[in-house]
Amino acid sequence: LFPYTTLFRSDKSIIDTELQLKDLETVESQLQKNQKIAALGNNKDAKILVNVLLAYKEVLEQGKNARSVTFESKEEQQAAHDLFLLTTKPVLYVANVDEASAKEGNEYSRRVEAIAAEEGAEVMVIAAKTEEDIAGLETYEDKQMFLEELGLEESGVNRLIKKAYALLNLETFITAGEMEVKAWTYHKGWKAPQCAGVIHTDFEKGFIRAEVIKYEDYLKYGSEAAVREAGKLGIEGKEY
């Protein structure tokens, strides 16, 4: 395990350094501009941004990721968010293992988990060859049978998508009609009008109400008309 762990740390260090240097370049450029603005007058936003940039500059010059910095005030948090630094992004490591280790992982993936834990990052295990085999099966039933034989509830691809969504604080709502069913991504905590805006900006501006069907009810009754007839269609306002 030692050579494997050393190699992973080395690769990780190279990537971290490249991203940190890019962030440092961004921070120094923004500092040069905003320190001048802050010095000219009583520009509160510029002064807040300068404080944020200086905090980031300090940790980046120490070879640390920008995500290691935390800010207490909402103004600082917003300024930090608007910089879109690469090393503030959440990290998910995907450990590719053999089929026998697809469910529980193995010693190698556990070493990756230990290293990732040092920076508060997440790890998930996936067997790429097994995923290829699953993708080659034609029916949903065949895929589920294959997964059950391996002791898995769902494919690694599905788990990866869910993990990434959770890490990015994203969720999905579905629109369904006679011609099309489509999934839409939104940020967790958004209200119905904001979600409507994902479909079209005019829907958010002119939002009045949303007709909502629970996913389980749609599967149970089979159509919007049947759900409506069963009294399971909800009408929600702007605060939903």
Q: What function would you assign to each model-found segment?
A:
Residues K33-Y240:
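C-terminal-of-GTPase-core extension/linker across diverse P-loop GTPases
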Residues R9-D11:
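A charged helix-plus-loop insertion that forms the helical arch/lid used to bind
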Residues Q20-D23, L49:
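Amphipathic alpha-helix face/heptad-repeat signature
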Residues F2-L7:
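Short, small-residue-biased leader/transition segments that mark boundaries at the very start
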Residues S13-L19:
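Short, charge/polar-rich alpha-helical segments
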Residues L24-Q32:
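Conserved phosphoryl-transfer catalytic core
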